[in-house]
């Protein structure tokens, strides 16, 4: 499943009529990306399925194949409940960039509805969602996701400080994480010109992996990192 995302990468590249050399370059960039193999070295995790389905969702949206897009989106949802966050961000990008408002709205609405249902089911019949990973953004010990959102709005300075705060005083894992995640791409992600809506696609990485001080969320060898490869 880790190698399978090469298929949608090639399909997306062909949709944009990239040269064969550029297609080879993009597939190698994915294959040699530290998080691609690093996230699979710890154990078998459901996240290894997520990248393929998310990229297939993107390909279907680019091709304006609505039914295939919805099918791939549902497969991504079946992998794990927080996959809805990535789909929501993708839909937001399509909507705000005016790239495809119709499919952007479909992705956003489906992601929001699924996420609310999934949270309700997990809280009612399971052990609850793992929102304690963001306890560094709680107002008090009994906080939840609502307090995380309140912290982002009410105290953005503190939240920014948490982005560079490690799990312990003598640790530098976030610095290493930044280097390993952004280093291989050099400055490519900052060459979007005036298409600022593209930076929306970075928000899952910032919110899920950098806001928290939970060490495995920014550990390059953790399977959690596989979520970001879309």
Residue ranges and their predicted role:
Residues 3-32, 51-52, 68:
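Transmembrane-helix signature of polytopic, membrane-embedded enzymes
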Residues 85, 199-230:
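Hydrophobic/aromatic-rich transmembrane helices and adjacent perimembrane loops
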Residues 86-113:
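Perimembrane helix-loop-helix junctions
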Residues 127-168:
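Luminal/periplasmic active-site loops of membrane-embedded glycosylation enzymes
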Residues 162, 174-199, 203-206:
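Hydrophobic, aromatic-rich transmembrane alpha-helices
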